[in-house]
């Protein structure tokens, strides 16, 4: 009996180890995407690049909530550099670091900061939330801000300890996360005070590090502008390199009006401050909590949404952080925003199509490529075509196109449309069609037969497959690709 029990235990342990070490499973949705290429000659596939500390980047990925153990770095870290991002967002976790007054335990955070650097990714850090050893303001997303006094004094000591420990390692500090979350919409004056005091403490220790304000989630500009005015009244705009916002909108293109108006308003108060899209993403299932809940998402829609969102905000010139590396276990739900699908133990099950989509964007849209509004399209197809021009070294090299008038659907079918592209003079060059979801690169040579330049700096394409997901029309010279 004992021998049988021991044998079963040994087999069970062996099976567990084998399961923990085996590679992630293939993804049914990804295989289906790859089986439905655009109806154009396939010539290759985007060549993905791993993260590299020496290479500047527009792109970041979220490694949040590990301060509350909703995810575990060791279980997914190997996949972070495969995304090709330049940066990763961490949360500092005051409550996890200082569980006894005045005693800081940084080992857990060291593993994340140093681990990312070893993987070729620059960490940036959101300083948050409250700490129950000092108050009941909360240590999670709904944490309340605190005024000057003993709690603030303890916070400032903690901030200085963090800045000292990670000087030269963390590239930017973000002060708090979503202070305007839910019922805290009248806390902008408290936030302005917290930001200025925190920013001064950081710069006292690390004069060179970047500082980011707000991490706002409110769809209204009022909170941001009220907080910024409060920061300005306290002489704090000099510390504000970036203002971050979290753009969770069902139709990503709907944010454009909001962000452009916010830029104009900020230019009158904080003209030297840039905007940063600091956290957003789409769920992979219909969720009953958190952002974008109540919509029938799936992994096709998720990947399309994230691609559209990345191009929308990059198209306005804003750096972008995608939420998030892995599914998060909140206890009361598994949040499905992850590039990696995980089980209840937080172990990777498979890489979602969203993972590959992010790889494709970081590979093609490098730091030396910039958005330009010099390109636009004309079409009578009956759909709103969103267009973002691509520029390198002052030269227009292509554009991204997609249907941007609705929430993305689950279909893998494209619509053949006729359109005119203004602002590109590339018809005699070797243009290719890059599917940003699959990473497939297709030839466009046959698409131009019988059609020349309609006028200087413009050309027409009689039949181009488009859908509700970005494709890029680009000179082949600028496309890193592996040949088919």
Regions found by a protein language model. Name each.
Residues 7-15:
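Bacterial N-terminal signal peptides
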Residues 19-78, 83, 478-484:
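Mature N-terminal, pre-catalytic/accessory segment of carbohydrate-active enzymes
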Residues 80-240, 247-250:
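Substrate-binding cleft and catalytic face of glycoside hydrolase catalytic domains
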Residues 188-312, 316-320:
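Noncatalytic carbohydrate-binding groove/subsite architecture in carbohydrate-active enzymes
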Residues 282-363, 372-383:
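Aromatic/acidic polysaccharide-binding cleft in carbohydrate-active enzymes
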Residues 443-484:
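C-terminal beta-strand-rich structural cap/linker in extracellular carbohydrate-active enzymes
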């Amino acid at each position: 009996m004992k021998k049988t029990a021991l044998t079963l235990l040994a087999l069970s342990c062996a099976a567990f180890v084998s399961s923990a070490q085996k590679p992630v499973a293939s993804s049914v949705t990804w295989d289906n995407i790859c089986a439905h290429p655009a109806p154009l000659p396939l010539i290759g596939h985007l060549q993905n690049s791993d993260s590299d500390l020496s290479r500047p980047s527009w792109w970041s990925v979220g490694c949040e909530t590990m301060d509350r153990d909703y995810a575990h770095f060791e279980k997914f870290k190997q996949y972070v550099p495969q995304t090709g991002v330049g940066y990763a967002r961490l949360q500092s976790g005051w409550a996890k670091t200082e569980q006894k007054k005045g005693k800081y335990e940084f080992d857990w955070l060291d593993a994340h900061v140093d681990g990312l650097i070893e993987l070729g990714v620059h960490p940036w850090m959101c300083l948050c939330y409250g700490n129950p050893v000092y108050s009941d303001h909360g240590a999670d997303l709904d944490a309340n801000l605190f005024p000057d006094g003993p709690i603030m004094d303890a916070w400032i000591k903690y901030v200085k300890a963090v800045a000292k420990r990670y000087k030269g390692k963390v590239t930017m500090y973000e002060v708090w996360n979503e202070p305007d979350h839910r019922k805290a919409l009248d806390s902008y004056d408290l936030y302005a005070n917290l930001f200025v005091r925190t920013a001064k403490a950081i710069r006292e220790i690390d004069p060179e590090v970047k500082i980011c304000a707000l991490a706002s989630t409110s769809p209204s500009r009022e909170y941001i502008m009220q907080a910024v005015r409060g920061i300005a009244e306290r002489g704090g705009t000099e510390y504000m390199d970036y203002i971050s916002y979290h753009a969770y909108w069902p139709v990503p293109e709907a944010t454009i009006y909001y962000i452009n108006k916010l830029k104009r308003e900020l230019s009158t108060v904080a003209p030297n401050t840039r905007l940063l899209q600091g956290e957003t993403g789409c769920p992979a299932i219909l969720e009953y909590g958190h952002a974008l809940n109540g919509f029938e998402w799936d992994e096709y829609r998720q990947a399309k949404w994230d691609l559209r969102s990345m191009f929308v905000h990059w198209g306005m010139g804003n750096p972008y952080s995608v939420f998030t590396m892995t599914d998060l276990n909140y206890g009361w739900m598994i949040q499905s925003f992850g590039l990696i699908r995980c089980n209840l133990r937080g172990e990777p099950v498979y890489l979602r199509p969203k993972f590959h989509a992010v790889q494709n964007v970081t590979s093609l849209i490098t730091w030396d490529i910039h958005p330009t509004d010099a390109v636009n399209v004309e079409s009578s197809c009956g759909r709103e075509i969103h267009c973002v021009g691509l520029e390198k070294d002052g030269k227009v090299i292509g554009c991204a196109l997609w249907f941007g008038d609705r929430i993305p659907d689950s279909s893998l079918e494209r619509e053949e449309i006729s359109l005119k592209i203004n602002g590109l003079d590339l018809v005699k060059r070797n243009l290719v069609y890059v599917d940003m979801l699959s990473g497939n690169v297709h030839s466009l040579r046959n698409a131009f037969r019988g059609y020349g330049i309609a006028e200087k700096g413009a050309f027409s394409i009689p039949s181009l497959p488009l859908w509700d997901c970005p494709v890029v029309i680009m000179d082949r010279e600028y496309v890193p690709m592996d040949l088919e």
